[in-house]
Amino acid sequence: MSAEEGTGDSTTAEVIEVVGKTGMHGEAMQVKCRIQEGSNQGRIITRNVLGPVRMGDVLQLRETQRDADSIGGR
């Protein structure tokens, strides 16, 4: 999404922790983020993010109800 496009129904969330890499080849990062507005304001959820991401980044989420599954280990 470019900066010129409208945000529509999206909600902003700030990355507070990078949990680790996930996906078949480690192409996605799992992050914990705090919802900054809306009915779920202040709630911390886990999401999978493609591309470079670090603490303090702000994400635009289309919906805030779903959590990502935790990264499994052996």
UniProtKB/Swiss-Prot annotation:
Pfam families: Ribosomal_S28e. One of its GO terms (cellular component) is cytosolic small ribosomal subunit. GO terms for biological process: maturation of SSU-rRNA; ribosomal small subunit assembly; translation. SUPFAM superfamilies: Nucleic acid-binding proteins (SSF50249). CDD domains: S1_S28E. Keywords: Ribonucleoprotein, Ribosomal protein. One of its GO terms (molecular function) is structural constituent of ribosome. Belongs to the eukaryotic ribosomal protein eS28 family. This is Small ribosomal subunit protein eS28. The gene is rps28e.
